[in-house]
């Protein structure tokens, strides 16, 4: 009886984790872009603008899917790297 209880708890935890992972699968954060699963057409421009990205986009391949990758704004310290002398 105790084993069944532990089995049910483990199953519930697994299901919750799978739902959490599935919710995040539509957007993937890469270093300089945020990618969304969609067709790579002019709709990418609308997707990026609706999420607040104004620096353009490109078609990317990720997790065996193709999608719109919206370019992030770079911070000033990322654009200009200090010289190390």
Curated annotation (Swiss-Prot):
Transmembrane segments: none annotated. Keywords: Antimicrobial, Disulfide bond, Fungicide, Plant defense, Secreted, Signal. GO terms for cellular component: extracellular region. Belongs to the DEFL family. Disulfide bonds join 35-70, 40-59, 44-68, 48-69. Coiled coil: none annotated. This is Defensin-like protein 76. The gene is LCR86. It comes from the Eukaryota. One of its GO terms (biological process) is killing of cells of another organism. Residues 1-27 form the signal peptide. It is found in: Secreted. The lineage of its organism: Eukaryota, Viridiplantae, Streptophyta, Embryophyta, Tracheophyta.
């Amino acid at each position: 009886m105790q084993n069944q209880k532990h089995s049910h708890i483990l199953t519930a935890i697994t299901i919750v984790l799978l739902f959490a992972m599935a919710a995040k699968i539509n957007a993937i954060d890469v270093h300089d872009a945020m990618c969304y699963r969609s067709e790579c057409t002019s709709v990418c421009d609308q997707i990026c603008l609706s999420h607040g990205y104004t620096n353009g986009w490109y078609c990317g391949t990720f997790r065996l899917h193709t999608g719109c990758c919206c370019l992030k704004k770079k911070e000033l310290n990322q654009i200009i790297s200090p010289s190390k002398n």
